[in-house]
Amino acid sequence: MSFDRKQVPNWRPGYRFQYEPAQKGHVLLYPEGMIKLNDSASLIGGLIDGKRDVNAIITELEQQFPGVPEVADDIEQFMEVARGEHWITLA
């Protein structure tokens, strides 16, 4: 089954994506704690706004990083993990 790139990701209520100077990186805050995101996840997370679909996020990052193979696959994998961990909804 293929991933539907027309879905629009949004952070779940209670989850907040932000830059945390003490962590020297982006984090995802939620009521039970915090997750420090790696650079790739931070770039993707910064584009999750509840308006852009996954295709738009892929297009944006492919333009920022031309010639980087598998950008789309990496974004799909992030979306699957984030949904599985209940960080985001996909509608």
Curated annotation (Swiss-Prot):
Keyword DNA repair: no
InterPro entries xrefs: PQQD, PqqD_bac, PqqD_sf
Signal peptide: none
Top-rank taxon, per record: Bacteria
Pathway: Cofactor biosynthesis; pyrroloquinoline quinone biosynthesis
Keywords: PQQ biosynthesis
One MF term in the entry's GO annotations: quinone binding
Example GO biological process: pyrroloquinoline quinone biosynthetic process
UniProt cross-references to Gene3D superfamilies, sorted A to Z: Coenzyme PQQ synthesis protein D (PqqD)
Function: Functions as a PqqA binding protein and presents PqqA to PqqE, in the pyrroloquinoline quinone (PQQ) biosynthetic pathway.
HAMAP family from the UniProt entry: PQQ_syn_PqqD
Oligomer status and interactors: Monomer. Interacts with PqqE.
Family: Belongs to the PqqD family.
Protein's name according to its UniProt entry: PqqA binding protein
Organism: Pseudomonas putida (strain W619)
Gene name for this UniProt entry: pqqD
